[in-house]
Amino acid sequence: MKRLDLILNGKGGVGKSFFAVNLVQFLKDRGIAHVAIDSDNENSTLKRFHPDTRFLDLGNRRELDGIFGALEKSNLVVMDCRAASTDLFIDYFAEIDLSAVLSELGATLTLVMPVNHESDSVDQIQRLTDQFGKKCNYVVVRNASHSDSFALFESSEVRAQLKDKLGGREISMTRLQDWLVEALNAENLTITAATKHPAFNLLDRQRLQTWQRKLYAEIESAADLLLPTK
């Protein structure tokens, strides 16, 4: 079964692109064939770190069709969706009858939804689950980059709904030291590349490798919802 992973949360700054960069690197490190798509015309973070990433203009419906053109040719498509794009995808998927298209392609959709300590990020997840219900799979990425408290999400109705009714999965993305994030951005390096780069000393390379191992283990724990299935 083919897989379309949309990394989506209408709120900006919740870690969509950072997770996307590391998920795509996971796929490369594991030798998993895929197509990566960036849709952020202001930042294009995914394409900056992975130059082989395709770019699609969300304002152009013909370009949006390229998501499914890619899925016709690949078993896995990963798309980093820019902030404030929830309404656009809801409208577009209704226009094309998403369920019918996925059925024709032999594919499933997974919404990968980063969440942090802010209520807006939780509200956006509620909005997506209200809209799509059981039509797709859900993976929530608990992003601790700014706070390790997820009290609002943990006490929310949507978390209970995801766990009890929708088969959702939660994975964690722990905080990476600020100076390491800044250095990765300054050098335009993925963590895998940084562990072999002279700009990073021994201890920082160790920090990066430890962080990456933890995230990769989290991704693998949700592989049945993130990767193609036989």
Where does each model-flagged region fall?
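Conserved C-terminal guanine-recognition region of P-loop GTPase G domains, centered on the G4
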Residues: 99, 119-135
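Switch II (G3) loop of P-loop NTPases
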Residues: 75-93
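Beta-strand-loop-alpha "switch" segments that mediate conformational coupling across diverse proteins
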Residues: 145-146, 151-153, 160-210
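Conserved beta-strand segments of the P-loop GTPase G domain that flank and frequently precede/overlap
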Residues: 37, 111-116, 140-144
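Short beta-strand-centered segment that lines the nucleotide-binding/catalytic pocket of NTP-utilizing
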Residues: 31-44
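Glycine-rich phosphate-binding P-loop
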Residues: 7-21
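P-loop NTPase switch/communication element
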Residues: 42-57
